[in-house]
């Protein structure tokens, strides 16, 4: 186990991220889900919660830049998880919506996410989790100031 300190904090965060992505890739494969990378999950989650969205709104909600979102949407569209639909009121605008294929994998994605979160916070009390979340929120605000 890594002892986290100021000198390896960013390394530790990256290591955690890589381990979680590897877990997600393994679980997606085990469930027979292909064409989705772990970094695409937030896009599908946002669309599931918010419904059909304009590309610009999806960009804002995902905190990713437009070129990244465009590439992710193209990938998800190619694999049948989302569709692009021109806005009925303004043909310049593109709406993104999940497909039936995305809806069918939702239960597996929720199960994978729940299992991962349960393991991630195993052994932490409610108070420890609250402290962790408060500290990470403060760190996130500090990063926003960079």
Q: Model-derived features: where do they sit?
A:
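Short, locally clustered residues in the helix-turn-helix/winged-helix DNA-binding domain
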Residues: 45-49, 137
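C-terminal regulatory/oligomerization modules of transcriptional regulators
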Residues: 1-3, 127-146
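Charged, amphipathic alpha-helical coiled-coil/dimerization segments
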Residues: 26, 74-137
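Short capping segments at the starts of secondary-structure elements
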Residues: 50-54
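Pre-recognition alpha-helix immediately N-terminal to the DNA-recognition helix
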Residues: 23, 42-45, 104
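Residues within helix-turn-helix
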Residues: 55-56, 67, 74, 94
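N-terminal leader segment of winged-helix/HTH proteins
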Residues: 1-34
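The alpha-helix within a helix-turn-helix
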Residues: 59
